[in-house]
Amino acid sequence: MTDLRELQQWFVQVLRSPVGQEQLIEQRVVAGGNGMSAMDRVAIYGSSYYARLVQVMETEFPVLQQTLGEELFSQFALSYISHYPPQDYTLNKLGEYFPEFLYRSKPQEDDQWSSFIVELAHLERLINEVYHGEGPEREEHVPATEIEAILSEAWTKTMQCSFQLHRYYLDVRKAISTGGDTSEVELPEAISCRVAIFRRDYKVKLHAF
């Protein structure tokens, strides 16, 4: 008799990749009374499983999703999830390796568009880490304009950018929140800068310097 933990682990594996598991699926999964086979029922669960993970990725990378478009973003996300399935108890870390995955997926010729997409993914990943990480809310902190003090804070992260990413990110987020057309937001200029990502009152802030 298979214990519950083993059965759960097996079922998760089947949802990710049912190929080669057909016989066990027929033995362990009860077919419905509507004519659906056990494989059909597992396929429904599998589709829902991946759809939910793509939704998590869209939540973590909303500006990237708007920039790439829903279809292309979903293709990248599904390919990424197949290589890096969730391993942690929280889905906050699901997109941890997504910027690196996109970097390795770049064309061999280093074009600006691909570099921009990778940097944008990196920025949104850092924003997610700062949002879910330690912060200054219980301590005295300096105003959000004093960059030297901000950089000295343990929870601050920095990123070297080849584009004015902070402006583009903020403009797209504003368009999303107000129901505007994100396609009207101009792509950022290819001007290098460094961006500090930090937190104030549980909100993530960006400061270019």
Go through each PLM region and give its residues:
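N-terminal, charged low-complexity regulatory/assembly segments
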Residues: 1-136
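Hydrophobic packing positions characteristic
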Residues: 82-209
